[in-house]
């Protein structure tokens, strides 16, 4: 028996697969889920979501969202989700640099500071997952 992992973004269902384990970046720290885990729900930070299938790890960059565990099913409702091999590193690097430059021009009191900070975290997660 295995866990069912579903990753969904506003645009599409990204993945539906049977897995042995899921590790995700929660807002209160990283955590793992295995078979028969207690039900819970948490918010996700931008970062690396890893699942293990048949002893092999697979990595996704998620741009925040929510994760729910119930009845051996893990549902990820992510703002964005990209498999490591699908990440355009040049585009991610440019997005990171652009967001970082915009953030440096803002103070924490600026209305757009929080949004730019989130853009930096999402782009950094994509670069990390892509291995760059």
UniProtKB/Swiss-Prot annotation:
Functional summary from the UniProt entry: Produces ATP from ADP in the presence of a proton gradient across the membrane.
Disulfide bonds: none
Keyword Lipid biosynthesis: no
Domain of life: Bacteria
Name of the protein in its database record: ATP synthase epsilon chain
PANTHER family per the UniProt record, alphabetical: ATP SYNTHASE DELTA/EPSILON CHAIN (PTHR13822), ATP SYNTHASE EPSILON CHAIN, CHLOROPLASTIC (PTHR13822:SF10)
Gene: atpC
Listed transmembrane segments: none
Family: Belongs to the ATPase epsilon chain family.
Subunit relationships: F-type ATPases have 2 components, CF(1) - the catalytic core - and CF(0) - the membrane proton channel. CF(1) has five subunits: alpha(3), beta(3), gamma(1), delta(1), epsilon(1). CF(0) has three main subunits: a, b and c.
InterPro entries assigned: ATP_synth_F1_dsu/esu, ATP_synth_F1_dsu/esu_N, ATP_synth_F1_esu_C, ATPsynth_dsu/esu_N
Main location class: membrane
UniProt source species: Anaeromyxobacter sp. (strain K)
Subcellular locations according to the entry: Cell inner membrane
Annotated Pfam families: ATP-synt_DE, ATP-synt_DE_N
Membrane topology: Peripheral membrane protein
GO cellular component, one term: plasma membrane
Keyword list, A-Z: ATP synthesis, Cell inner membrane, Cell membrane, CF(1), Hydrogen ion transport, Ion transport, Membrane, Transport
GO molecular function, one term: proton-transporting ATP synthase activity, rotational mechanism
